[in-house]
A protein has these predicted regions:
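AlphaC helix of the protein kinase catalytic domain
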Residues: 114-127
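ATP-binding glycine-rich loop module of kinase domains
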Residues: 37-79
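Structural motif at the C-terminus of the N-lobe alphaC helix and the adjacent alphaC-beta4 loop
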Residues: 77-87
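Conserved short submotifs of the Hanks-type protein kinase catalytic core
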Residues: 100-113
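Juxta-kinase regulatory segment immediately upstream of eukaryotic protein kinase catalytic domains
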Residues: 1-29
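Conserved alphaE helix
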Residues: 129-134
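Protein kinase glycine-rich loop
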Residues: 30-36
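Short beta-strand micro-motifs within the conserved protein kinase catalytic domain, predominantly
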Residues: 91-102
């Protein structure tokens, strides 16, 4: 595991990945680097407001697949976001192809990420393979 910095925020990765593109979105105020989806999340702020950037392509620490797999999954998710357009779901505001990944832009919503908590994921990874599969 290595730590790279996005602005002043540490981002834990399996190996180095260029994240300098995020500067173009604004000032980073939050980083989500512990997700099991293969994505990184960034809370950014600029003169237009606050936004959530979902990025696939970096070697995230809790994802067992490749960056290419994560990019493909996010491409498929973009299609779902477009079909799922509903007032209760944060709107997909934009999609940007990056040299090494894919970034999706959403409005920032106060809260916390849904899904498995990192401590549960860590505890499961400590189990033997037999116990994990049972």
């Amino acid at each position: 595991m290595i730590t790279v910095f996005v602005q002043e925020h540490p981002v834990r990765l399996k190996s180095w990945h260029d994240l300098s593109f995020i500067d173009g979105f604004g000032r980073v105020f939050q980083v989500f680097d512990h997700l099991i989806s293969g994505n990184l999340g960034f809370g950014v702020e600029n003169d237009k407001g606050r936004f959530f950037i979902k990025y696939a392509g970096a070697p995230t620490i809790n994802y067992l697949g490749s960056g290419e797999d994560a990019i493909e999954r996010l491409h498929r998710a973009v299609q779902t976001y477009q079909v799922l357009a509903h007032p209760a779901v944060p709107a997909l505001l934009g999609v940007e192809e990056m040299p090494q990944g894919l970034a999706c832009v959403f409005p920032w919503v106060e809260g916390y990420p849904l899904g498995p908590l990192p401590e549960h994921f860590f505890a499961m990874r400590q189990l033997s393979m037999v116990d994990r599969l049972s």
